[in-house]
Amino acid sequence: YGLVGSEMCIRDRLNFTSASTALLRIEADTAEDLLFSGSQWGKDITVSVEQNSVIARHPSGETVTVTFTPNVELAKTDNNYTALVRSPRYPVNVAISFFTSEKEMTANLQNLPSLLNNPAPALQANAERWEGYLTKILRKDMKPEYDRIAVKAVTTLISNWRTHRGGLLHEGIIPSHAVGYFVGFWAWDSWRFSAGTAKFDPELAKNNIRAMFDYQQPDGMIIDCIYTDPSENNARDSKPPLVCWAVDEIFTHTGDTAFVAEMYPQLLSYYRWWYEKRDHNRNGMCEYGATDGTLEAAAWESGMDNAIRFDGAVMLKNEGYEDAWSMDQESVDLNAYLALECKLLKKFSSLLKIPFDAPDYSSQVADYFFDKNINFFCDRRLKDGSFIEEPGCEAYTPLWTRIATQAQVDSMLPMLQDTAKFSTYIPFPTIAADNPKYNPRGYWRGPIWLDQTYFAIRGLRNYGYNRLADEYTLQVFDRLSGLKEGAPIHENYGTHTGERLKAPHFSWSSSHLLMMYDDYGK
């Protein structure tokens, strides 16, 4: 991008050359001197000038360095610096680096002079990396405006890629770099990111999964979210089980049986955990819950923090454990996910030639949760088995996981195609749009979340409704505000308007847009 002043136009470009270093290239239309300085240093930061580098040290041991070529005149001023480039020859190259320790900084600073003096190989590698991503993603039969959506989705995912640091023992993808509270790794977010990146960066996809399993509990539980500071991790709840799907996507694109073998025991342990600590009445149908007995954490475990279906829920202690609590309702989406996990675990066990030894209730889920009174999938109350008739996005999951019967899906079509309920301006909201509790800005009580919209669209495709699935896909692509233009991809959107709502630059929306793009017309 460029900065235009009254007498000068400055253009700069930033390219990552490694996980820790970005190369800043600066050009201007005159030969006037350039003066650089820092601003807004944190109060705990100590700034020093050492040889050709400005080093900003944090008490934690982390450092940021800004390294110049030898012809730049560096000076320290108070707790700041100046860098003067006299009669510059363009481009001016500057290396900006982040290191987690003094040792790491010392080892890497010695590599920067060669980068600054001859950046061409690193820039070529960067260009080839991006070309590789896009070659694997882009189709030859899509309109340019839809290709732009796919490129924007890839760019969003890669811009949210973070290297290992502190308590994050593997690299991975954060939900959004633009929002301070989204700078960790979440479980079901990570499964989506890995499924979305498996096609164009499978190694990143693998490490994203490994990062969450670094904190697998002794009983098999995968905790909700992890941070660079492990004291901030949330182990009160898990998240919906989609990880076997992510592993299978990686296997589909790589054929990497070694990765399947690495993950299988951990996947099996996590799958068993659900039936051990989230099946209150031991009937094979699980509930969302928490380790601490709070409804807040149990709702977080569903991933749908304030969903209308949980408005009347209460918590029940599960017999035999101090850290096992369930909501008093069995959830259709959870058990549909578990049915898919079971199917894929069986696939993996066959691939690895080892017996599958875990509960299998997958054949019972669809009939158990199908409410014939309204021809829709619903959660059920534990106390009497009655259905919680608040039709919502959880009903899309049996279609996506392919456990519904064709007759069930056919009978759902009138409600799914009702423009007052689910066939809205942007299709497939989190709750039927005519529900009295529907809130257009209510997070999981009305807005569009693109994972759920994807589950519905792919679900229709799974049962032969391809033309309808394509129509809904184009509604998403054409109607979401700014999607085909320059606006960032957001966390969720307005059901009746397509307006951008919560966090921008959102990874899981990007993953599912890539999936819609890939599925269209197939």
Predicted regions mapped to residue ranges:
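Aromatic/His-enriched, Gly/Pro-containing loop or helix-boundary segments
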Residues: S6, D219-P241, W245-F259, R500-A503
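TPR repeat positional signature
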Residues: C244-V247, N335, C342, T453
